[in-house]
Design a protein with these regions (language model features):
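Immediate post-signal peptide segment of exported/extracytoplasmic ligand-binding proteins
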Residues: 34-50, 76, 99-104, 157-166, ...
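A short C-terminal helix-loop "cap" of Rossmann-like NAD(P)-dependent dehydrogenase/epimerase domains
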Residues: 45, 71-75, 252-259, 292-294
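An extracytoplasmic/periplasmic, membrane-proximal ligand-sensing/linker region
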Residues: 45-47, 185, 272-329
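Hinge/capping helix and adjacent helix->loop/strand transition within the periplasmic-binding protein
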Residues: 94-103, 117-197, 201, 248, ...
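N-terminal secretory signal peptides
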Residues: 1-11, 16-36
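N-terminal (or domain-start) structured segment
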Residues: 38-128, 172-176, 188-215, 220-224, ...
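Conserved functional loop/turn residues at catalytic and ligand-binding sites
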Residues: 11, 16, 20, 82, ...
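C-terminal lobe and pocket-closing loops
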Residues: 137, 219-287, 319
Length: 329
């Protein structure tokens, strides 16, 4: 995130909250159809069920825990619900089939739902979920255990051509999987993959020598820097959480970056006024500088996204994913 973005975040948040409430005023009458109880009930009148699709300890879990008390200050109390399996597909299915009353939401790491849609293994489309608020756009890091004989990305490449190297993802058919697929395809690297449900399970496998390397987010990696060594960043720019780790581009390897977009999303057909309430609560929560400080201490650097921005980015990612459909089944 640029310095200017950080300076302007209050203006962004005011605009995001205002836009959300404006959308509610324009669309609430049309959206609030029977049952009439939804129109009359104060929202939220009870805890929101917040679905987390990766194991505790990873960045999706960590960021949700940091955000929770600030949302509660805005009148939105949440309880975390860990729904693991199939790279988030089990969790998305639960969200998709939930009652459309706004009492269930999920942290998404796009392009997860778009991948499910492209490979045809889910009964939903990415565009059917309703984006609430986004807070992060980050790339990936490739890591090995601290004392691994592989200490550079070039050594990783060389090792892949000598023997069977195994790399862990943080979810089958998830965005970490597709980024590794891009590495395999575009650099012609014949490594194998093992899939874990989040970095909380992938990192122990690396440190225990059960896999040679893993791909995961820079924030969770920074929290494990004493036990891990980082080979490269997949994005176009270095990550603030791991400022000393070079990008693949710097190392003269050209690979399509598949960035992660983190945002909260809701069940399809939730009334617009309820989406506006949640969006406004998130926007106001992110006005608190203490939240930003806690995120940075955890190695998570924020880039705030409106609903429209999230929807546009997800649509563009869906087009890129089509290139790797054959390796994600």
């Amino acid at each position: 995130m640029t310095g200017q973005s950080r300076i302007d975040r209050r203006g962004f948040l005011r605009n995001a909250g205002g836009a959300a409430l404006g959308a509610a005023a324009a669309g609430s009458i049309a959206q609030l159809t029977p049952p009439s109880a939804l129109a009359q009930e104060k929202f939220p009148a009870r805890d929101i069920n917040w679905i987390i699709y990766q194991a505790p300890g990873g960045s999706i879990d960590t960021t949700a825990r940091i955000i929770q008390p600030y949302l509660e200050k805005q009148g939105v109390k949440t309880s975390l619900d860990y729904v693991l399996g199939a790279g988030g597909r089990v969790a998305r299915t639960k969200l998709h089939t939930a009652r459309p009353d706004g009492y269930v939401m999920m942290t998404e790491s796009a392009p997860g739902a778009a991948i499910d849609e492209v490979i045809g293994r889910a009964g939903y489309k990415a565009s059917e979920f309703i984006a609430i608020f986004g807070w992060s756009v980050v790339s990936w890091q490739l890591c090995v255990k601290k004392d691994s004989p592989i200490q550079t990305f070039q050594q990783f490449v060389d090792e892949c051509h000598k023997r069977r190297v195994v790399v862990g993802t943080i979810g089958r058919s998830g965005s970490s999987h597709i980024q590794l697929a891009a590495l395999q395809k575009e650099l012609n690297l014949p490594f194998g993959m093992v899939h874990f449900e989040g970095s909380g399970k992938a990192y122990p496998a690396v440190m225990g020598g059960h896999v040679d390397a893993a791909i995961s987010g820079p924030g969770s990696g920074s929290r494990m820097h004493e036990s891990l060594h980082f080979l490269a960043i997949t994005g176009e720019e270095r990550e603030k959480a791991l400022p000393d780790v070079p990008t693949l581009t710097e190392l003269r390897f050209r690979v399509t970056p598949i960035d992660q977009i983190w945002y909260a999303m809701a069940t399809p057909k939730v009334p617009e006024d309820r989406i506006a309430t949640l969006s406004s609560a998130f926007a106001k929560a992110f006005e608190d500088k203490m939240l930003w400080e806690q995120m940075q201490k955890a190695g998570e650097y924020l880039k705030l996204l409106t609903r429209a921005q999230v929807e546009d980015m997800v649509a563009k990612q869906t087009e890129v994913i089509e290139k790797y459909k054959d390796v994600l089944g």
